[in-house]
Amino acid sequence: MRIILLGAPGAGKGTQAQFIMAKFGIPQISTGDMLRAAIKAGTELGKQAKSVIDAGQLVSDDIILGLVKERIAQDDCAKGFLLDGFPRTIPQADGLKEVGVVVDYVIEFDVADSVIVERMAGRRAHLASGRTYHNVYNPPKVEGKDDVTGEDLVIREDDKEETVLARLGVYHNQTAPLIAYYGKEAEAGNTQYLKFDGTKAVAEVSAELEKALA
């Protein structure tokens, strides 16, 4: 079961990824984790990646694809894997195909931007402890104050509305072509494209996922 996950930041992708991994016993493959592991292990691709990063440049698709190919050849990927954060572009999607990676399912979690902004912008944090709250879904006992210490809660930079909107803009620009690409792949019978309503309750989305992947 080889899966690609698509979904905007705040669409609940991470939560459902954990569910799929636990339910079907497949690992999540994150390009960031792979890069760090290859650099630490000092592999040939790791050395190439390190020299590029040290020079302040972006790691090329060729290196990333090489790492993906190495990673999915490992024993824990025998039953499948979950690709998160890759591919991000059409050349990367083409590259996956060229190195012979067959994708069984492309799963999109669809949530309107306005809902994501509400989800993210309502978050409040107590930085010292890491405790987080939400004005609507998980409010503190006293507005703006941490339940335990009574100290002020803050809005993290990442959760500010303008930051969230900027990240969503980047996501849509990058992902709209991929959604069209995998839609065509599904029409051609090369993969299955599944779309879920990410505004539903977590347990409901998980149940729908389990049914679709069974």
From Swiss-Prot:
Record-linked InterPro entries: Adenyl_kin_sub, Adenylat/UMP-CMP_kin, Adenylat_kinase_CS, Adenylate_kinase_lid-dom, P-loop_NTPase
Pathway annotation from the record: Purine metabolism; AMP biosynthesis via salvage pathway; AMP from ADP: step 1/1
Chain residue ranges for the region called LID: 122-159
SUPFAM superfamilies attached to this UniProt entry: P-loop containing nucleoside triphosphate hydrolases
Biological process, per Gene Ontology: AMP salvage
Binding site for ATP: G10, A11, G12, K13, G14, T15, R123, T132, Y133, K200
Region feature (NMP): 30-59
Record-listed E.C. numbers: 2.7.4.3
GO MF, any single term: adenylate kinase activity
Region forming the signal peptide: none
PROSITE patterns xrefs: ADENYLATE_KINASE
Annotated binding of AMP, by residue: T31, R36, Q57, L58, V59, G85, F86, P87, R88, Q92, R156, R167
Assigned GO CC terms: cytoplasm
Keyword Transmembrane among UniProt keywords: no
Catalytically driven reaction(s): AMP + ATP = 2 ADP
Subcellular location: Cytoplasm
Keywords: ATP-binding, Cytoplasm, Kinase, Nucleotide biosynthesis, Nucleotide-binding, Transferase
Functional summary from the UniProt entry: Catalyzes the reversible transfer of the terminal phosphate group between ATP and AMP. Plays an important role in cellular energy homeostasis and in adenine nucleotide metabolism.
Subunit structure: Monomer.
Entry note about domains: Consists of three domains, a large central CORE domain and two small peripheral domains, NMPbind and LID, which undergo movements during catalysis. The LID domain closes over the site of phosphoryl transfer upon ATP binding. Assembling and dissambling the active center during each catalytic cycle provides an effective means to prevent ATP hydrolysis.
Family to which this protein belongs: Belongs to the adenylate kinase family.
NCBIfam families for the chain: adk, PRK00279.1-1, PRK00279.1-2, PRK00279.1-3
The name this protein goes by in its record: Adenylate kinase
Organism: Photobacterium profundum (strain SS9)
Gene name in the database record: adk
